[in-house]
């Protein structure tokens, strides 16, 4: 049964401005440490925009937004063996997922020229 669903569209230009102004500091503020290691040197802005879209969709699925002690670094976008994105929640985000009774996550992520979009589904 679906217990949460979230969707987000992130403008790549908005992420590019943060990257241009703060660089690695911007990335470390929104990425989990495992994601920082996986961030490609080529086109980091598209990577950041995609990860941010998933994180926004995830907090919508959790029903919390970025509040109650849940921040972007509590949500990790990992990579499944076949290469698909997968959600790994940490800290209060993981506790909220457990409180919802969710045991599975589904993530869809896509990039266009100007945007990155993501859908997250939480399932019990």
Curated annotation (Swiss-Prot):
Q: Where mainly found?
A: cytoplasm
Q: Does the keyword Ribosomal protein apply?
A: no
In the UniProt record, what gene is named as encoding this protein?
acpS
Kindly state which keywords UniProt assigns to this record, in alphabetical order: Cytoplasm, Fatty acid biosynthesis, Fatty acid metabolism, Lipid biosynthesis, Lipid metabolism, Magnesium, Metal-binding, Transferase
Q: Required cofactors, per record?
A: Mg(2+)
Molecular function GO terms recorded: holo-[acyl-carrier-protein] synthase activity; magnesium ion binding
Q: Which organism is it from?
A: Nitratidesulfovibrio vulgaris (strain ATCC 29579 / DSM 644 / CCUG 34227 / NCIMB 8303 / VKM B-1760 / Hildenborough) (Desulfovibrio vulgaris)
Q: What does this protein do?
A: Transfers the 4'-phosphopantetheine moiety from coenzyme A to a Ser of acyl-carrier-protein.
Q: What is this protein called?
A: Holo-[acyl-carrier-protein] synthase
Which reaction(s) does its UniProt entry say it catalyses? apo-[ACP] + CoA = holo-[ACP] + adenosine 3',5'-bisphosphate + H(+)
